[in-house]
Amino acid sequence: NLTRRIARAAGNLGEGICIEIGPGPGGLTRALLLEGARKVIAIERDRRSIEALQDLVDAADGRLEIIEADAMDIDLTTLGDAPRRVIANLPYNVGTPMLLSWLKRAEAFESFTLMFQKEVAERISASPSTPQYGRLSIAARWRAEVFPLFDIPPRAFTPAPKITSQ
């Protein structure tokens, strides 16, 4: 299962908190809880998604909290106890600005397990002397250890986008 694979890639979920950005209907949220997350704080701005997540909140025995907000407006370093792990299938149009803002406070986070459009992921993880190397890879490598995990084909999503994710 793809969502469980992503959750396992995030490391030891049993300590600290997992911050999930844009949980939508909760596929990754369920996987985080099934993989033993002690606490998941999910930030969602879409009221319909929040309503869809309510059954999961009820079943999670206090391990899931939903914050109705735009994640760009929240200081994630104020949420829960460290260690903080950010795990997200980021909206592609705001993924890069979010990452850059979090990297400014990288010491407040244990890890980031993030999905981007493959071309953006390649720019984030690019090595010097490659065509993709630039401002984004410099910022990411300066503040974090960066490595791509796996490709996710368009057919893994409904509706299927025209791009591969990583």
Feature map (PLM): residue ranges:
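Catalytic cores of RNA-modifying enzymes
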Residues: 1-166
